[in-house]
Each structure stands twice: as structure tokens, then as C-alpha cells.
């Protein structure tokens, strides 16, 4: 089980990323625009740098909903590989079963 502080930190990052997504996209659009002047691009760049660091979506880490494990998480289920296996064996995941051939 992951430390609860790490889980809460990730939740905070997800909220910040969602909150600043529109602003961040608008500034990035200005930076990648061919029509924007050099001064506009510099201004957009400084505004982007002044946004909270945790508002960047690349700082958010997918975690298992049950254990908080940061690696080996299946996006489709939101569970880590160990918890997904346990849930599958208990029959909690509909349509999923152990392979045998």
C-alpha cells in the first residue's frame, strides 16, 4: 500500500491539471502559432512558466484505486496488476477470467 500522502498528492495534481488545462492549452497554442509575434510568444512563455508546477498533466501519475501502487496499472480498470488478478479470481470483474488454452 502506498503512503496516503503520495495518494493525496496525486489527487491534488489531477485537480490542478484539470483546473488549468484550458489556460495551459491556450498558452501552448500561442507558442506553437506561426502567426504570433516574438513578443507574444515570450509573454505566453513567461505566463506558462508562472502556472503552478503541479498543474502540468505530465506530473500526474496513474495509481491503483485499491492499493495506490504507481506502476503496473491498467487504465481500463484503474487497478494495479496484483489487485486486478485478485479481483478477477474473485469474479468481481465481469467478462474477465483466467486464460487457459
Curated annotation (Swiss-Prot):
**Source domain of life:** Bacteria
Q: Which GO terms describe its biological process?
A: translation
Write one Pfam family the protein is assigned to. Ribosomal_S14
Which is one GO molecular function term here? rRNA binding
* Region (Disordered), start-end ranges: 32-65
Q: Does the keyword rRNA-binding apply?
A: yes
Question: One Gene Ontology cellular component annotation?
Answer: small ribosomal subunit
Q: Which UniProt keywords apply?
A: Ribonucleoprotein, Ribosomal protein, RNA-binding, rRNA-binding
Subunit composition and interactions: Part of the 30S ribosomal subunit. Contacts proteins S3 and S10.
Q: Which NCBIfam families does the record match to this protein?
A: PRK08881.1
* Chain's role: Binds 16S rRNA, required for the assembly of 30S particles and may also be responsible for determining the conformation of the 16S rRNA at the A site.
Q: Which family does it belong to?
A: Belongs to the universal ribosomal protein uS14 family.
Record HAMAP family: Ribosomal_uS14_1
- Write the protein's name: Small ribosomal subunit protein uS14
Species annotation = Xanthomonas euvesicatoria pv. vesicatoria (strain 85-10) (Xanthomonas campestris pv. vesicatoria)
Q: Which classification does the entry list for the species?
A: Bacteria, Pseudomonadati, Pseudomonadota, Gammaproteobacteria, Lysobacterales
Amino acid at each position: 500500500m502506498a503512503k496516503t500522502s503520495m495518494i493525496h498528492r496525486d489527487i491534488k495534481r489531477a485537480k490542478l491539471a484539470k483546473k488549468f488545462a484550458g489556460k495551459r492549452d491556450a498558452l501552448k497554442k500561442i507558442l506553437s502559432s506561426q502567426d504570433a509575434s516574438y513578443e507574444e510568444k515570450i509573454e505566453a512563455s513567461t505566463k506558462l512558466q508562472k502556472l503552478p508546477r503541479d498543474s502540468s498533466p505530465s506530473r500526474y501519475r496513474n495509481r491503483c484505486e485499491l492499493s495506490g501502487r504507481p506502476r503496473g496499472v491498467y487504465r481500463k480498470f484503474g487497478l494495479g496488476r496484483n489487485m486486478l488478478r485478485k479481483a478477477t479470481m474473485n469474479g468481481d470483474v465481469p467478462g474477465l477470467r483466467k486464460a487457459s488454452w
